[in-house]
């Protein structure tokens, strides 16, 4: 079994791919799971019942989580080599045009790879809406152009509560559809949703202007995507597990038989 792990700031998502099933298709796996950041101890138990022969991980949540993941894999699979995915000048069919390719977050690069393998030969805007919202442009030929980073929906709302005297912490929900709210809680939600949707729409407009001959797809992913999606005035394609699809693509490119 091939274990793929997407360790983010809030949740750890993982899948297991059956390497004996012949030709691999990115995004097709045997079993999937997730755990909250504070629940990493449960991962070893979840993985222990499988025969894991290869592990590919993306971690953007720091050294402490990396050590916890190493311990979980050791407990579940023994002393096997861990492959830590990092951004390089090229991988999985995507070329990284960052000035310093290694500086690009591994999750953003993997998401771009996943989007490109799912929707090849067309320009893409990849919006991943999590703790942070990242909005990246990929050309039809697989060139990662660059992107935007802004606070995620929940982080944006909590920043108002934490840094102002009179604005409350609010529960984010999808029922706030009016742009001009008649109460403070709804006004915060409306403003944060408008900022997120507006950034995505601006990115799509800019990338589409650079590629007038190609049909651009906006790919929407991440835990807050379903809250933001109804407020977009543009067409989009909702995709789950984009980072894991990208990792699966890289694994296939480097060793097709796992």
From Swiss-Prot:
Co-factor binding details: A monovalent cation. Ammonium or potassium.
Pathway: Cofactor biosynthesis; coenzyme A biosynthesis; CoA from (R)-pantothenate: step 1/5
Biological process terms in GO annotation: coenzyme A biosynthetic process
SUPFAM superfamilies named among the record's database cross-references: Actin-like ATPase domain
Disulfide bridge partners, by residue number: none
GO MF terms held by the record: ATP binding; pantothenate kinase activity
Enzyme nomenclature, EC number: 2.7.1.33
Keyword set includes Nucleotide-binding: yes
UniProt entry keywords in alphabetical sequence: ATP-binding, Coenzyme A biosynthesis, Cytoplasm, Kinase, Nucleotide-binding, Potassium, Transferase
Cofactor(s), names only, from the UniProt record: NH4(+); K(+)
Subunit structure: Homodimer.
Role this protein plays: Catalyzes the phosphorylation of pantothenate (Pan), the first step in CoA biosynthesis.
Family label: Belongs to the type III pantothenate kinase family.
Name of this chain's protein: Type III pantothenate kinase
């Amino acid at each position: 079994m091939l274990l793929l792990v997407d360790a983010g700031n809030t949740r750890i998502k993982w899948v297991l791919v059956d390497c004996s099933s012949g030709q691999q298709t990115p995004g097709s796996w045997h079993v999937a799971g997730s755990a909250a950041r504070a629940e990493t101890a449960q991962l070893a138990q979840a993985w222990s019942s499988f025969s894991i022969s290869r592990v590919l991980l993306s971690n953007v949540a720091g050294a402490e989580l990396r050590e916890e993941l190493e311990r979980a894999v050791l407990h579940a699979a023994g002393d096997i080599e861990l492959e830590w995915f990092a951004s390089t000048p090229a991988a999985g069919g995507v070329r990284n045009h960052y000035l310093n390719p290694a500086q690009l977050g591994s999750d953003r690069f993997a998401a771009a790879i996943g989007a490109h393998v799912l929707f090849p030969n067309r320009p893409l805007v990849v919006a991943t809406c999590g703790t942070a919202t990242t909005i990246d442009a990929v050309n039809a030929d697989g060139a990662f152009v660059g992107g935007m980073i802004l606070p995620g929906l929940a982080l944006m709302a909590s920043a108002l509560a934490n840094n102002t005297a009179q604005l409350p912490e609010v529960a984010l929900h999808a029922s706030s559809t009016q742009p001009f709210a008649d109460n403070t809680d709804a006004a915060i939600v409306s403003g944060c949703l408008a900022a997120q949707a507006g950034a995505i729409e601006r990115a799509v407009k800019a990338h589409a202007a650079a590629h007038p001959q190609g049909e651009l797809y906006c790919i929407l992913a991440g835990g807050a995507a379903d809250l933001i999606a109804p407020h977009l005035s543009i067409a989009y394609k909702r995709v789950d597990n984009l980072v894991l699809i990208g990792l699966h693509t890289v694994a296939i490119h480097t060793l097709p038989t796992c």
